[in-house]
Amino acid sequence: EDNTPAEDATPVETRENKVIYGSTTEISGDLGNAWWTNNATDKMIRDLINDYDTVIFDQFGQMVMNATTAASIDQVHNDDGSITFTVKINEGLTYNNGEPITAADYVAYALVAYSPVTTEAGAKISAESVVGAAAYQAGETKELAGVRLLDPYTYSIQITPEKANYYFAMTYASLAPLYLPLYGGEGLTVKDDGNGAYLDGGELTVDGVNASRYVYEGRVVAGPYMIKSLDTGALTATLEINPNYNGNFEGQKPSIQTVVIVKAEDDTMMDAFKTGEINFLSQLGEGDKINAALDLVDAGGFNYCHYTRNGYGKLMFQCDFGPTQFAAVRQAIAYLLDREEFANTFCGGYGSVVHGPYSTAQWMYQDSEEFFNDNLNTYSYDPAKAVEVLSLIHIS
């Protein structure tokens, strides 16, 4: 008989594979592709449930082809100055419900976006970039001439001469899959008889387009997550991994099973974070909140990541009437603003001043930092200079 005492089993700590994200803006529940509104939390949810664009911006703001969705993107410069992008979609992509994604789903995005019905539903979508989009949006043509469904996995999109030389013109080649039954019923399909793509077999309606914005239960999506529940009254949303997601442009797939998004109140978010009511915060830009978060890190049990914001704040002038129509007035105001002091006061030493429409996180700034520093007017705080520039004009 073995009288050796049994060793005590060491309990294994298990944690639920879930993140509770505290957002500082309220969920409105509009999931309509930013064609109507673009609430920050709604956008975050849309970004988590939608994906598979054929061209994306990477972590450094550079345009890259999404190799998960696109096999190739070719472009041809046409004699009239337009550009035609031809995009071949990878086979094997599916929605979260298992239905296959083909080029028709990508073309459907353009047909719904530029549809006169979508405009009538209150969406604001410019038709300037795609050949034939203005006529299609106005209801003058059935076909969208500049968008072609070439075969089950290939589409093309023709960009107008006026937009073809845009630095980011490649982004115009990008479409994303759109699940037509969500917008127009089961009978709606995409066809192309040679004169451009068009919708057939059903009816796209204003009510259907608007209703699509607020479908939560069973919503068919193509992103890393899918909606389990969304409650605009409670200001919460619960997302779960989409098992049919093939990965982002780098092939990365989500590993956190459940993401719960809640409203984080400014006055109590740190207490909620400390007690575990919230366990993830991001985009903290105010110095007081950053310092409070770092105090929790110092106390133990928390971690953080510092990153440079891909954006900037600004003071906008109305330049077509009133005193600010004069450049000298705008310059004088700039000289009277101590932007360094403002940035330090607001950001608590965690922010910096930029001198144009760029972010220090962007690759174009990082590649040209010396040029920016040597050539841009920094408009340093200088009341005397403000008086000087104003003295050069006469305003009556």
State where each predicted segment sits:
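Structural transition elements
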Residues: 353-396
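Extracellular/periplasmic solute-recognition and catalytic clefts
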Residues: 228-240, 260-321, 340, 344-346, ...
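Surface-exposed binding/hinge segments that line
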Residues: 122-202
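Aromatic- and charge-enriched surface segment that lines or borders ligand/interaction sites
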Residues: 71-126, 150, 156, 272, ...
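Gly/Pro-rich hinge or "lid" segments in bacterial periplasmic/extracellular proteins
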Residues: 59, 171-254, 258, 268
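Short, well-ordered beta-strand elements
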Residues: 15-26, 84-87, 223-226, 237, ...
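Short, low-complexity disordered leader/linker segments with a strong preference
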Residues: 1-18
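N-terminal lobe/hinge region of extracytoplasmic solute-binding protein
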Residues: 22-78
